[in-house]
């Protein structure tokens, strides 16, 4: 039964892609490689475009131009998350229309990896139908950009510095070892940053709250292989439900990180 439901959901993604193209065309919406809007990428899982420009949010190197997400978030000061845009998501009218059209069966879209192997934006209309019906499998075969297997037993609960962090959690999407949905994230980002918001959305849907628009965008700087953090947005279709827009820091207290390579060291 679980496999049949999984295949059905995958087939419906193709029809959703067609619907989305029509909506975008009608609105004369131009979607560039650098936008954080919906990217219909279901058919290109694992594909690497020729361009090294990431499909998700990419921050220019220091001195070239200011990027609003990192500028708004500022430096890490001890909080795992900070509000962006007063907590108001940036979903477009077309994305909300898609959400209403897919409010029952759901929808998922994962941008292709860029030329450096980095993830882009992941967008979904989350419902009970997108949630998994079977236990999560192994993801150890996936090596996200900047990945290192390194441990600090005395500093980190769980010992290992890096986790394979799902942009859209398995418990929300049923997507497991999808390389377009996994980034190199610290244990702190995964547990203190992303998990509370993921559980909030999951509980909301399971308790009858209805469909939720959801987007997770890794934020890189220049050609760095490890994201500086994740921009996370959610909004329920029903008014008065769930809504947030936050930046989650990809840091680990007590550990220094070279975001260009993923190398790390103990801080004094």
Placement of each model-derived feature along the sequence:
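N-terminal Lys/Arg-rich, disordered targeting/topogenic segments
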Residues: 1-13
């Amino acid at each position: 039964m679980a496999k049949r439901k999984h295949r059905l959901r995958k087939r419906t993604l193709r029809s959703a892609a067609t619907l989305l193209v029509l909506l975008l065309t009608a609105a004369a919406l131009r979607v560039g490689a650098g936008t954080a809007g919906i990217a219909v990428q279901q058919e290109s899982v694992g594909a690497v475009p020729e361009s090294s420009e990431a499909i998700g949010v990419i921050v220019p190197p220091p001195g070239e131009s200011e990027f609003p997400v990192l500028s708004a978030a500022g430096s890490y000061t001890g909080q795992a998350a900070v509000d962006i845009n007063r907590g108001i998501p940036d979903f477009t009218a077309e994305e909300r229309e898609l959400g209403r059209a897919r409010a029952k069966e759901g929808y998922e879209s994962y941008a292709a990896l860029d030329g450096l192997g980095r993830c882009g934006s992941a967008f979904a209309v989350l419902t009970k139908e997108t949630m998994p019906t079977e236990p999560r499998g192994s993801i150890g075969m996936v090596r996200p950009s900047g990945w290192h297997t390194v441990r600090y037993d005395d500093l980190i609960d769980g010992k290992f510095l890096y986790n394979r962090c799902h942009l859209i959690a398995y418990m929300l999407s049923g997507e497991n070892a999808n390389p377009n949905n996994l980034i190199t994230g610290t244990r702190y980002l995964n547990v203190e940053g992303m998990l509370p918001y993921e559980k909030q959305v999951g509980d909301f849907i399971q308790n009858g709250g209805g469909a939720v628009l959801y987007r997770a965008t890794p934020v890189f700087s220049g050609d760095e292989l490890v994201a500086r953090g994740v921009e996370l947005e959610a909004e329920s279709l029903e008014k008065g439900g769930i809504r947030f827009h936050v930046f989650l820091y990809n840091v680990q207290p007590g550990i220094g990180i070279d975001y260009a390579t993923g190398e790390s060291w103990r801080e004094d």
